[in-house]
Amino acid sequence: MRRHMSKRGGSFSRRAMLLAALGLAGIAASGTALGADIAIVVRPDVPVDNLTFAELRRLFLGDRQFWTSNLRVTLLVRAPGAREREVVLKTIYQMSEAQFRQYWIAKVFRAEAASGPRIVYSSEMAAELVSGMPGAVAFVDADLAPKGLKVLKINGLLPGTKGYPLH
């Protein structure tokens, strides 16, 4: 007896394979391998090479607003849904997505910051903006950190080193 297959659906295994392929394509399209380290990147003229984890946290929380007396920090943060953002929310901010949004709304409302972080939609966009914006700092997949930008050490460690905190 022949099994009937609808013209719309196909078999269960075909659907499962298609969904699995789409899932893998989504991971590949995100540009970030699961478990890859996250690099903090700045322009080469930023006068900092190393940050302690506490300093990094203050930077991304907007508590440190200047690199030097005349070079303002501009935070660039990946859009919601990016793996890099999830890692940074968990490790640096130690907040959920909702807490992060509320934190920046309150900080701007209290006039502790002129605005929240600027949103970027890819590591490539982050790198391009950091290159052209004095004082900008962003986080990108360490494997995609572009040449020409400075990768900051965290607690004296570069991405890929044992003990590096952002992964």
For each of these PLM feature ranges, what is it?
Residues L19-A25:
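Sec-dependent N-terminal signal peptides
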